[in-house]
């Protein structure tokens, strides 16, 4: 196939993809070239090249594939801007403070997968190696720290990840009941070189820190599904994860080694179906990992003040109860309520562009998802969710989690198999969010409406028009609240909402031919 797209704001896209028989198997290939400026005063000039090449051979009973993927891009970044500068007319919504922000990225990967299945067993092995290299330039506080050169900083990162996954599943019986058991192992090794540099117009001024990091993780798991009765089954699992961190920093005090391990049990109880309806209860434990550098840190590399270390792995516990039903013809619905606790919440720092380990947190929520296909040519997806997110400890600053979305909803309709016509329309809503812990500053809600309509000119040729932000909403994609300083302000700057707008209304045209 060949696909060519053009649109407003410098949008250009070309895609070539296909597959053919080769050496007893199948060779798949694809190449994408992409450019977009966006609606910003200084265009993003986002250039991207994507390529994939995959050779596969075998059947469902056994086979393998080898895949190579390459991705490279470069862009200008219009980062979040202070609301006060838009309110007083200094900037428009699509302006920037530091026009030299941006970055370059590349990602190359090579992977292989093998599987072998019999009537009662299934074995899978896959491995991959990925090299990521990026260099990002950002300036979120403008002139707060350095009134002469500005606060731009660079985050160079070069990492190679190597991973091996293997699993074996078999059917059998447990206490005379039909049962399936899976055992598996996952091994990952990351070699990372990164840093934090002070820059001006992408030129290095000084070095805050440089680090060489080696992170090794091993996870082993066992999962069993047993059908105890016609309408009752369980899924029981246990996983053990071990992480080893080694950091060699340009600041000797921040070098070191540490390790951590956690066991994560999980249990699911599934009842039914009755009248095409199932009920389920899930409970379990998991974790998130922290930045390896934080596990051995001793001093703040920027201020020189003593710094607290963070645990390598942070415990998470959760439970969920739900119902899945198809009792209404052509409608699949799921309703669930859940609770999720973290021993330490990962908080994104809008003024630094980094995450930090925060206070213990809890989320309690409800989700309702629906997939409805009233006719062969119309599909409707409707989802709504609400979550109450709070810190669990007591602190005078407040209990709200900055940036935690409280309510989200989406409604989408797609049309196909309606003669030569096809299309889709999607509405999405993200509710207001607290921006600081005491909830005194909140973002507004974000609403988008996107759509597309197409016509099949012939059996192998189609044309499609896409529209983005059809209501031309002035919503924000992100909002943060922190201190920054503009050139005409005092040394302490001001606390303010900083936002990045969603893109303005735009249209694109795509022509696709299949051979």
Each language-model region and where it sits:
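C-terminal beta-barrel architecture of Gram-negative outer-membrane proteins
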Residues: 32, 37, 302, 389-391, ...
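Transmembrane beta-barrel wall of Gram-negative outer-membrane proteins
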Residues: 6-35, 40-78, 101-122, 170, ...
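Membrane-embedded beta-barrel scaffold of Gram-negative outer-membrane proteins
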Residues: 15, 20, 113, 122-140, ...
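Gram-negative outer-membrane beta-barrel transporters
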Residues: 167-170, 334-343, 356-437, 510-514
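C-terminal beta-signal and adjacent terminal beta-strands/loops
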Residues: 338, 432-433, 455-515
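Surface-exposed extracellular loop regions of Gram-negative outer-membrane beta-barrel proteins
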Residues: 74-91, 189-198, 242-249, 257, ...
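Transmembrane beta-strands of outer-membrane beta-barrel pores
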Residues: 4-10, 22, 33-37, 59, ...
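Face-selective signature of the C-terminal outer-membrane beta-barrel domain
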Residues: 63-69, 103-250, 270-272, 327, ...
């Amino acid at each position: 196939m060949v696909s060519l797209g053009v649109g407003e704001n410098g949008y250009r896209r070309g895609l070539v993809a296909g597959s053919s028989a080769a050496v007893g198997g199948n060779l798949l290939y694809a190449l994408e070239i992409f450019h977009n400026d966006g609606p910003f005063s200084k265009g993003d000039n986002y250039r991207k090249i994507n390529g994939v090449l995959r050779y596969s051979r075998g059947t469902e009973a056994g086979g393998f594939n080898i895949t190579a993927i390459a991705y490279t891009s470069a862009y200008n970044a219009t980062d979040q801007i202070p609301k006060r500068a838009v309110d007083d007319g200094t900037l428009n919504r699509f302006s920037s403070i530091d026009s030299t922000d941006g970055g370059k990225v590349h990602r190359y990967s090579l992977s292989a997968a093998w599987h072998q299945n019999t009537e009662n067993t299934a074995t899978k092995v896959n491995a991959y190696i990925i090299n990521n290299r990026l260099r990002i330039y950002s300036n979120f506080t403008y002139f707060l720290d350095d009134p002469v050169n500005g606060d731009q900083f660079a985050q160079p990162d070069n990492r190679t990840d190597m991973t091996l996954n293997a699993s074996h599943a078999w059917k059998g019986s447990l206490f005379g009941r039909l049962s399936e058991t899976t055992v598996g192992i996952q091994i990952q090794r990351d070699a990372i070189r990164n840093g934090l540099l002070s820059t001006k117009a992408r030129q290095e001024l000084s070095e805050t820190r440089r680090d060489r990091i080696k992170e090794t993780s091993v996870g082993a798991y066992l999962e069993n599904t047993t059908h105890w009765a016609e309408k009752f089954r369980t899924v029981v699992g246990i996983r053990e994860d071990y992480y080893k961190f080694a950091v060699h920093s340009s600041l000797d005090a921040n070098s070191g080694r540490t390790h951590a391990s956690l066991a994560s049990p999980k249990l699911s109880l599934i009842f039914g179906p009755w009248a095409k309806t199932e009920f389920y209860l899930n409970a379990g434990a998991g974790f998130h990992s922290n930045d390896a550098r934080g596990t051995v840190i001793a001093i703040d590399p920027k201020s020189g003040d003593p710094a607290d270390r963070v645990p390598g792995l942070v415990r998470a516990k959760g439970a969920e109860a739900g119902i899945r039903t198809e009792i209404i013809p052509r409608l699949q619905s799921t309703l669930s309520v859940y609770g999720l606790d973290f021993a330490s919440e990962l908080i994104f720092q809008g003024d630094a562009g980094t995450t930090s380990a925060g206070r213990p947190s809890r989320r309690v929520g409800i989700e309702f998802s629906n997939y409805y296909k009233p006719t062969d040519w119309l599909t409707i997806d409707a989802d709504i969710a609400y979550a109450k997110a709070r810190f669990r400890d007591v602190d005078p600053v407040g209990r709200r989690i900055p940036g935690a979305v409280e309510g989200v909803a989406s409604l989408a309709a797609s049309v196909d198999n309606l003669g030569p016509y096809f299309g889709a329309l999607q509405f999405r809503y993200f509710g207001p969010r607290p921006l600081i812990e005491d909830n005194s500053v909140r973002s507004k809600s974000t609403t988008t409406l996107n759509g597309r309509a197409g016509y099949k000119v012939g059996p192998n040729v189609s044309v499609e028009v896409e529209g983005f932000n059809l209501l031309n909403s002035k919503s924000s994609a992100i909002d943060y609240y922190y201190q920054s300083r503009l050139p005409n302000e005092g040394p302490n700057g001001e606390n303010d909402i900083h936002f990045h707008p969603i893109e303005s209304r735009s249209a694109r045209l795509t022509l696709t031919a299949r051979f």
